[in-house]
Amino acid sequence: MARRADSFCLISCVLVSFVISVSAVTDDSQDKQVYVVYMGSLPSSRLEYTPMSHHMSILQEVTGESSVEGRLVRSYKRSFNGFAARLTESERERVAEMEGVVSVFPDINYKLQTTASWDFLGLKEGKNTKRNLAIESDTIIGFIDSGIWPESESFSDKGFGPPPKKWKGVCSAGKNFTCNNKLIGARDYTNEGTRDIEGHGTHTASTAAGNAVKNTSFYGIGNGTARGGVPASRIAAYKACSEMGCTTESVLSAFDDAIADGVDLISISLGANLVRTYETDPIAIGAFHAMVKGILTVQSAGNGGPNPGSVMSVAPWILTVAASNTNRGFVTKVVLGNGKTFVGKSLNAFDLKGKNYPLYGGSTDGPLLRGKILVSEDKVSSEIVVANINENYHDYAYVSILPSSALSKDDFDSVISYVNSTKSPHGTVLKSEAIFNQAAPKVAGFSSRGPNTIAVDILKPDVTAPGVEILAAFSPLNSPAQDKRDNRHVKYSVLSGTSMSCPHVAGVAAYIKTFHPEWSPSMIQSAIMTTAWPMNATGTAVASTEFAYGAGHVDPIAAINPGLVYEIGKSDHIAFLCGLNYNATSLKLIAGEAVTCTGKTLPRNLNYPSMSAKLPKSESSFIVTFNRTVTNVGTPNSTYKSKIVLNHGSNLKVEVSPSVLSMKSVKEKQSFTVTVSGSNIDPKLPSSANLIWSDGTHNVRSPIVVYTYSVSD
């Protein structure tokens, strides 16, 4: 998701907040609207099964109509089974009761969440970074987003050979759109063509896998080389999002095609305002079937922070990414006539050349504004003012259509005091500049927080990555301020949001896959989580704990050699869903095979790289256990010893049994149990610790979080 100026919803890896907008088609008798009918996996034997014919027959049976072509919107038939159709409420109810149907849910509208960042992560350009270019060139990342700008230099195929032989996709992108050996595939589900109008999809794709392009900047600000984490990788663009958002049926269509086309990873920077259960969340559905085919899905956490429980990506088979800043930030200085200087946040490309203008702190209406710098509590974009100084301070720089700077409350009050106490107050707003941010990384305020409200014992988000003030390729069809009054057009622009952090982690996942092409999605996810930089709970609120950053900040270099990994297969996820009380009939359809939910599998015992448990508030003392199994991907004859590090303020007692793991061979698996006990947990904060398995070379770290807090508290 990215953040835009003014009403710009945070764009997060597509995550401007998920606004629900159901489109209805009026019939003479009842209103019809688009519903998605999810039917699980495709039959294992498809010789006599034609998905579309089955879907049409269901519609004929339910509607009583012989011709239902006008009812069918999409048929999902390549990677999983289902369809989207226009139904009345009573027809929806009848479909939901039919054998072979897992769920029926409305087609809601998802929206997008929107150079130095890779250097900050340690994945530097040049010979000092280890790369496997042959496999990197065979790695394909699919982006489900707003399309792509194919002419961008970031997607040039100079030096690229033909697409990998495994590629089964097409370039079905519309008129005047050409794919190449870098951008090897494009599909459109919006009827607009795959060309990116918003700029969001172009930005995310270039962040993960764009070519290295020298001397890029935003009007001279932040000059450097723009590049992706895996610039030799191939890109496939799936346009599921238009200016109006991203429909459920389009998102599922994109997953259906991307999986069958042969992508290796999926990056999706989209999200919703309301969390959805797994069987009604199109991203969770698509990502599950991708996981079964060996494809990891990376999704933005959302831009609903710092509110607790705002994380919308909550499935354990998805790698969920929060957003943090880097050591490069953009600031805009305000210089007053009395010589005082204040440092604010914005991305101001306008140069007033130090000229002073009258400051005006009155009404925002009328001719008194003309030719002045307006000092107001909120951002304005009036065309008659020279510039704007406001109190709308955020921890990210926004692009405006006129010179502006957002100050902290104290600094803004100082400016107001100067305006009110001076006969002829004047000042100026300088052009933005890049500064070194020594305090980085810090989770952005807009980044969505846990706890997970669907599976309370699964910690989300998983990790954090750069998502603040990211410079990357952009669509010249949109303005950098994303405002129709802004007549500027740029090839590279700066966006903030979890939409920007998501492709960073997609790039990291692709980087790992170039060294370990045989690794499963869960192994890659585990490597990223257990090697992440530890972050500290810097505040006294839930929003400043592991619910903000998960396992920590991604470290690409460490992640290619994690030592141990936590593996999770399809059967483990099915057992997890059994533990959440999904019935065996629905799970059989989802899994495409017989399922028996025997006993009660505790969701917290899913072999996840982090450990989390929500405790009953009624219990003053507690004991919880976590069962885990690790696989050795390091060296043979290695011995790992466990170490527990309690976080500040935690009074937990943590025991690990066995406390030593002796791995004789690579791929060997060993199990252990973590027992956590304590009493009187703070009802407003989690208590946490870290389990570290170390063999002297590798440090395999897992956060342990116990809490009683509820979002409704």
UniProtKB/Swiss-Prot annotation:
Localization per record: Secreted
A GO CC term assigned to this protein in UniProt: extracellular region
Post-translational modification: The C-terminal propeptide is autocleaved.
CDD domains documented for this protein: Peptidases_S8_3 (cd04852)
Domain Inhibitor I9: 34-112
Broadest EC class assigned to this enzyme: hydrolase
Domain Peptidase S8: 117-560
Chain residues in the propeptide: 25-113
Sugar attachment sites: 176, 215, 223, 420, 536, 583, 627, 637
Pfam families cross-referenced by the UniProt entry: fn3_6, Inhibitor_I9, Peptidase_S8
GO molecular function: serine-type endopeptidase activity
Keywords: Autocatalytic cleavage, Glycoprotein, Hydrolase, Protease, Secreted, Serine protease, Signal, Zymogen
EC number per UniProt: 3.4.21.-
Span of domain PA: 356-415
Family designation: Belongs to the peptidase S8 family.
Designated name of the protein: Subtilisin-like protease SBT4.9
Organism: Arabidopsis thaliana
Gene that this polypeptide is encoded by: SBT4.9
